[in-house]
Amino acid sequence: MGTEAEQPSPPAQQQDQENPPLCKAQNPKPARLYRFVLIFVAGSLAAWTFHALSSTNLVWKLRQLHHLPTAHYLQTRDEFALYSVEELNAFKEFYDKSVSDSVGASYTEAEQTNIKEALGALRMAQDLYLAGKDDKAARLFEHALALAPRHPEVLLRYGEFLEHNQRNIVLADQYYFQALTISPSNSEALANRQRTADVVQSLDERRLESLDSKRDALSAIHESNGALRRAKKEAYFQHIYHSVGIEGNTMTLAQTRSILETRMAVDGKSIDEHNEILGMDLAMKYINASLVQKIDITIKDILELHRRVLGHVDPIEGGEFRRNQVYVGGHIPPGPGDLALLMQRFERWLNSEHSSTLHPVNYAALAHYKLVHIHPFVDGNGRTSRLLMNTLLMRAGYPPVIIPKQQRSKYYHFLKLANEGDIRPFVRFIADCTEKTLDLYLWATSDLPQQIPMLIQTESEAGERLAQMQSPNVAQRSSILEFYESGSGDLP
């Protein structure tokens, strides 16, 4: 009784014709095979790219490693190694090849000309030395070294001249070490270093003992001493003035002090130069209020330190690891992908039991070098490294060390030598600055509490201040003034 009679269903083929599928696959197997091949090729390409980048990074690391001889005469002491022995051994096969490649690299035409001239000057210098004309010989040795600073023969002969004629065994040992770094099989440099290494190590240890004695003498002065308080205040200004000056800041000491005391701008100076000084002030206050009392220094502490250093100059990059590759003169720091691992290793070393056994000056200088070598930030690496160094020294009872901006070229030269394998000249440079800073404090708290020589910047100011001073020790005063004004000279 239905209103519509049931109709028979049409054949399946007819349904397909009437309602064709939107996308009908004729044969799914070739499409799957094509996708599989495409994924395989893409994966292989990605793996090859990763391997190439890793190999490039490995080459960088290998070229930064110190030589790994087993002989005592070529090694610096274990605490001076940037990488662990395990890391060095893991890379040794590749490292030996990279060293042989670099040693066998051909010289450019200009380098060949310089080497030829250097060797000629070297022969003339040796002849003059044998003839007893030491002054002329010294000048020719220096000329040869300037022309070919990494030629083993030049380093060896100049080192012998310094050792036997100038009685400068420390510098001679440094040149023997450099000669062996470039040419490990040099038998003459080897014999010379066997003779000098232990003597130089003994001299370095005696120097550190002397620094400890001066530190103890300074520690014996009560905190309530008025001269000590004034010395600390002026040293604070000096530290900031010289640290930003090393990086190119053109503020004078008087302008630096004015900014810190009044927070007023100085006419004719850029905003960045003002902000660099204010950032250092923030970082120093953070150290005094927090870091000096901490047992361990962490990555977070270093980032907080850097955040304050760049807080006014570049607040976005402050306290952040860099995200790009940077180049620092001839030094190529690690890529951004390696920073997290390298900083973790640095943190472990910084707080290790082994590091706690190092002399504070060695420890602080090494920490400075290791951090600036990693170069974890876009900007502010030098300032942050110097602040970390002084944090470690202050925890050991030393005052913050002042590296005069006039010695900027020496400072960078010794960092370059450390990159080439010998960190001892840099450690000695920091020890020298430490001693001069200690001498300044001891001098300021002895017979002239009313005047701190670090304040003086110009010859006219120096003459005016000297006229006001009544102490009989004029030679000592002049020596201190010379160091802090010219960046050279030795304190008595």
From Swiss-Prot:
It catalyses: L-tyrosyl-[protein] + ATP = O-(5'-adenylyl)-L-tyrosyl-[protein] + diphosphate; L-threonyl-[protein] + ATP = 3-O-(5'-adenylyl)-L-threonyl-[protein] + diphosphate; 3-O-(5'-adenylyl)-L-threonyl-[protein] + H2O = L-threonyl-[protein] + AMP + H(+). ATP binds at residues 247, 328-331, 379-386, 411-412, 419. The keyword Nuclease does not apply. The side chain of Glu-247 determines which of the two opposing activities (AMPylase or de-AMPylase) will take place. In response to endoplasmic reticulum stress, mediates de-AMPylase activity. Adenylyltransferase activity is inhibited by the inhibitory helix present at the N-terminus: Glu-247 binds ATP and competes with ATP-binding at Arg-386, thereby preventing adenylyltransferase activity. In unstressed cells, disengagement of Glu-247 promotes adenylyltransferase activity. Its main location: membrane. One of its GO terms (biological process) is protein adenylylation. Residues 1-26 are annotated as: Disordered. It is a single-pass membrane protein. Its EC number is 2.7.7.108, 3.1.4.-. The chain crosses the membrane at residues 33-55. The keyword Transmembrane applies. SUPFAM superfamilies: Fic-like, TPR-like. It comes from the Eukaryota. Signal peptide: none annotated. It is found in: Membrane. Protein that can both mediate the addition of adenosine 5'-monophosphate (AMP) to specific residues of target proteins (AMPylation), and the removal of the same modification from target proteins (de-AMPylation), depending on the context. The side chain of Glu-247 determines which of the two opposing activities (AMPylase or de-AMPylase) will take place. Acts as a key regulator of the unfolded protein response (UPR) by mediating AMPylation or de-AMPylation of Hsc70-3/BiP. This is Protein adenylyltransferase Fic. It comes from Drosophila melanogaster (Fruit fly). The gene is Fic.
